[in-house]
UniProtKB/Swiss-Prot annotation:
PROSITE patterns linked to this entry: ZINC_PROTEASE
Co-factor note (free text): Binds 1 zinc ion.
GO biological process per UniProt: peptide metabolic process; protein processing involved in protein targeting to mitochondrion
Catalysed reactions listed for this entry: Release of an N-terminal octapeptide as second stage of processing of some proteins imported into the mitochondrion
Major place of residence: mitochondrion
Family: Belongs to the peptidase M3 family.
Protein name per the record: Mitochondrial intermediate peptidase
Alphabetical list of Pfam families matching this protein: Peptidase_M3
EC category name: hydrolase
GO CC list: mitochondrial matrix; mitochondrion
Gene name of the encoded protein: OCT1
Alphabetically ordered keywords of this record: Hydrolase, Metal-binding, Metalloprotease, Mitochondrion, Protease, Transit peptide, Zinc
Function: Cleaves proteins, imported into the mitochondrion, to their mature size. While most mitochondrial precursor proteins are processed to the mature form in one step by mitochondrial processing peptidase (MPP), the sequential cleavage by MIP of an octapeptide after initial processing by MPP is a required step for a subgroup of nuclear-encoded precursor proteins destined for the matrix or the inner membrane.
Cofactor requirement: Zn(2+)
Protein species of origin: Mycosarcoma maydis (Corn smut fungus)
Length: 889
């Protein structure tokens, strides 16, 4: 018998449950004024894969895969292939497949003094980060005062009208000013290997976020914004994009409770703070870390008093477990005496997840399932207090539920529309889920034909009497057996054909074919990137054949943005994948910086001169470069994004490149969907640039990329054997995709259940004194039963809801991923299924969807892209229609 230390137990718990935690940064702007900090639009890999498998008990570990189309004998056709482009693609492949091992070997790393992080001259040392934040705040105060004073401007004078017309642009400038530092600090505090830099970035982040929280309750800014939208002479001069920006700010103000009377506004702030603390504790519990609030102290005292998390397993239930697995399980037991093993449900979840997969005795799996879904009374109480606090917050704003409050600026608009969508989607996918379930029931039948009768019990839910009833604790084991079956386990590996460099070069070829956009490796200046080891961070220019900055790319193309690729795992770096937006597109030549100093004042009322803040023309302390554009008038700052992954770094040339698994290729394509959205969505206003759009729309471009990667025509562009150069055989891809999607219907059905649970938890139910999150889960689980499975993911005594981390980060919007999966399937079939490399189809999607960022109603975008006017209104009928489309599996 061996007992692991408390820290080791917690570490194991953290690993086992890490995919439950909402690690992803929000996919769009934060729901408060000016807080649309462009934290990574896509969520780390969790938001793609875990949204399908949020529980370890999910029906399958299969990956999303789409219909395979056999390529024509002619192979894919590239639009105007150019030899220079292929040279650049070859350089990309070489750069990522064999990154330099020393600075002297890196021809893309220049020498000389530091140019500053992201080539910001002032950021040459961590000490300067807070100084930059302070300069930014001082500059922001001038803008705030100027906007506030515009509210008292005389609208009957030319100057008064001029100032009022500048309000939306000035608010957007203010947002860009603050987010430019906050977004960068968010990246640096997470990714920089030097603790000094990380701490300095965190200090700057918290400093400016604190100021932003003050702005969220600035009644002067709210009043002047509301006022200009009611002045016809001003409102009529706003472009559609500017109007969209104004509406975003207005909604975010009101979601912050700014329109409430003082006493109610104070309560709003109190509740918001409480929700934040509760949410952090909720996620810390899931991660296996110790929360520090009152609920954590109650839970600790309860566990010490009654040992409620202790689980006993008779050893004779484990006799048929693989000896190697059993040895590891027994070694982890807290006690092993008299034929009984004891474990901690709170600290050793990996034990129970292992037994759910590999314990043939159903009694052991049933105990393991309940333990894997263990939730202390205090954890349940914390979640329910979180949901009730949200319900009270919504009531303060005049909404009937938190979902109603949160969905006003989403595609769904209101909870009833989400329910229409999910109801239609449930009906569409139920037959497919039942079909997949029967595959697992047959495996159970084959395994239990000689077992005692209690293992093959029947019920009124079992419409196929020849197959045994399926319990929640059966899922993991028979899913594991399903994928180990002869027909699926013999699938040929794809990794030898999928080196990081080949995939990156293939992405460049794909975007060139579709959008006339490609990648080119670029020189990295000293001090420009956060991890300066040779080859740690690569810089990639994004070029457009007909648009972009004049005369910057050294070719006939124009520069439209920059991607920094931080792909290799290193100590201290966050796991998973993420897309960070460091800088957004914005038109700058119309900025009236001089007017800030004329009309604005410091917070203490002082007149401020440009030289007081660093010199003449000090508009933005970041001093971001700006460029004239070939396709439109004006000067723009260009988007800068960071693509972060944790792939294994290649060794020396003899060891070969980093070879990716299929799910890692999907991850790269998914995150690149966000990146290309940022590159193409170069709007005139920061606040609607790129991925700054509705939460339930932002995943469309990235999910669509998953369709591309499973197309043979596209795979032909990127899959080459790393040593022979041979193309990936079609039959290898076909068999892999068939295997990976073989239980997709069941996975999707379970995700629908979680989306419906999220809606119930954020409905009026949460405000009821008798509300029980466990009862609500149990009732929904029974309601959504499948033939032969009276319960999908619940059994008495379990509390699976306390493992559903997305309840905090995506409260009432968990349906978003499902909605965008449906839309992506429809767009794929409408535009790309017949020819994934068609330039005309690519231009339609580029010009009717991607280029608008968040500046156009997503329903109008969808109607235009699909030629489906029936969904243009985005009402309940539109949501119901989208639900009926279903997700192609």
């Amino acid at each position: 018998m061996a007992s692991t230390s408390k820290n080791a137990q917690r570490a194991a718990a953290s690993v086992a449950h890490s995919y439950h935690v909402c690690l992803a940064r929000r996919m769009s702007r934060l729901p408060t004024l000016l807080s649309n900090i462009s934290a990574p639009a896509a969520s780390k890999a969790l938001d793609r894969y875990e949204s399908k498998r949020i529980h370890s008990r999910s029906f399958s570990s299969s990956l999303a895969a789409q219909r395979v189309q056999r390529p024509t004998s002619a192979g894919p056709i590239l639009t105007n292939p150019i030899s220079d482009h292929e040279k650049d693609n070859d350089e990309l492949r070489s750069l990522f497949d064999a990154p330099p091992t020393s600075s002297s070997a890196n021809h893309l790393r220049s020498s000389g003094p530091s140019t500053g992080l992201f080539e910001i001259p002032s950021l040459t040392s961590p000490q300067n980060f807070l100084v930059l934040a302070q300069q930014t705040l001082a500059r922001a105060q001038l803008l705030v005062d100027r906007i506030d004073r515009a509210g008292s401007a005389d609208a009957s004078t030319a100057q008064g009208i001029k100032e009022l017309k500048e309000v939306v642009r000035n608010l957007d400038r203010l947002s860009d000013l603050l987010c430019g530092v906050i977004d960068m600090a968010e990246l640096v505090r997470n990714a920089h290997p030097d603790p000094e830099w990380a701490e300095a970035a965190n200090a700057a982040y918290e400093y400016l976020c604190g100021y932003m929280n003050v702005l969220n309750t600035h009644t002067g800014l709210y009043s002047v914004l509301k006022n200009i939208l009611s002045i016809k002479e001003v409102a009529e001069t706003l472009s559609k994009e500017a109007t969209a920006v104004a509406q975003v700010f207005l909604r975010d103000f009101e979601k912050s409770g700014i329109h409430l009377p003082p006493a109610e506004r104070e309560r709003f702030v109190q509740l918001s703070d409480e929700i934040l603390v509760l949410g952090r504790g909720f996620l810390q519990d899931i991660a296996g870390n110790d929360a520090s609030d009152d609920f954590a102290r109650i839970a600790s005292a309860q566990a010490d008093a009654d040992k409620s998390d202790m689980v006993g397993l008779p050893t004779h239930w484990l006799e048929d477990v693989n000896p190697t697995i059993l040895k590891a399980v027994r070694a982890s037991a807290i006690t092993d005496t008299d034929g009984l093993l004891t474990f901690s449900a709170a600290d050793q979840p990996w034990v129970f997840q292992t037994l759910l997969k590999y314990a043939p005795d159903e009694r052991a799996r049933k105990v393991a399932f309940r333990a894997a879904n263990y939730g202390s009374q205090a954890q349940v109480q914390r979640l329910e207090r979180l949901l009730k606090a949200r319900a009270e917050l919504a009531t303060l704003t005049g909404a009937s539920s938190y979902a109603e409050m949160a969905l006003g600026d989403k595609m769904a608009k209101e909870p009833q529309n989400v329910e229409e969508f999910l109801r239609a989607l449930t009906k569409h996918h139920r037959p497919r889920a039942s079909h997949d379930l029967d595959k697992l029931r047959r495996l159970k039948h084959n395994a239990t034909v000689s077992e005692p009768a209690q293992n093959t019990r029947q019920s009124t839910f079992n419409t196929n009497s020849t197959l045994p009833e399926f319990a929640p604790w059966d899922r993991d084991m028979y899913t594991e057996q399903h994928f180990r079956s002869a027909s699926l386990s013999n699938v040929q590996p794809l990794s030898p054909y999928l080196s990081v460099g080949s995939v990156f070069a293939g992405l460049s070829r794909l975007f060139s074919a579709l959008y006339g956009i490609r990648f080119r490796a670029s020189m990295v200046a000293p001090g420009e990137v956060w991890s300066e080891g040779a080859g740690d961070v690569m810089k990639v220019e994004v070029l457009d054949e007909s648009e972009g900055a004049r005369g910057t790319s050294g070719s006939a193309e124009g520069l439209i943005g920059t991607i920094y690729a931080d792909l290799w795992s290193r100590e201290g770096k966050p796991g998973g994948a993420a897309h960070y937006t460091v800088r957004c597109s914005r038109r700058v030549d119309k900025d009236d910086e001089a007017g800030d100093f004329t009309y604005g004042r410091a917070e203490d009322g002082r007149v401020v001169r440009p030289q007081d803040l660093g010199g003449e023309g000090c508009g933005n302390p970041l001093q971001a470069p700006t460029f004239e554009q070939r396709e439109r008038p004006g000067r723009y700052q260009l988007p800068v994004v960071v693509l972060m992954c944790d792939f294994a770094r290649p060794g020396n040339a003899n060891q070969g490149p980093c070879l990716l698994g299929w799910h890692e290729v999907e991850t790269l394509f998914h995150e690149m969907g966000h990146a290309i959205h940022s590159m193409i969505g170069r709007t005139s206003y920061h606040n609607v640039s790129g991925t700054r759009c509705a939460t339930d729309f932002v995943e469309l471009p990235s999910i669509l990329m998953e369709h591309f990667v499973s197309s043979p025509q596209v795979v032909h562009l990127l899959a080459r054997h790393h040593s022979t150069g041979a193309s990936l055989p079609f039959e290898h891809l076909s068999s892999h995709l068939a295997a990976s999607k073989s239980l997709e219907g069941l996975d999707t059905y379970h995700q629908i259940l979680l989306a419906r649970l999220d809606q119930l938890y954020h409905s009026q139910l949460a405000a009821s004194p008798s509300f029980s999150s466990t009862t609500t889960y149990s009732d929904l689980d029974r309601q959504m039963h499948l033939p032969g499975a009276p319960n999908l993911s619940y059994t008495e005594g379990a509390h699976p809801q306390v493992r559903f981390g997305h309840l905090f980060g995506y409260g009432s919007t968990y349906y978003s991923y499902l909605l965008d999966r449906v839309i992506a399937s429809k767009v794929w079939n409408h535009l790309f299924a017949n020819n994934p490399l068609d330039r005309y189809a690519g231009q339609v999607f580029k010009n009717q969807c991607l280029k608008y960022g968040g500046g156009k109603d997503p329903w109008h975008i969808l109607a235009d892209v699909l030629n489906e006017d029936s969904v243009r209104q985005g009402d309940s009928r539109a949501m119901q229609q989208v639900g009926k489309w279903g997700i192609e599996c």
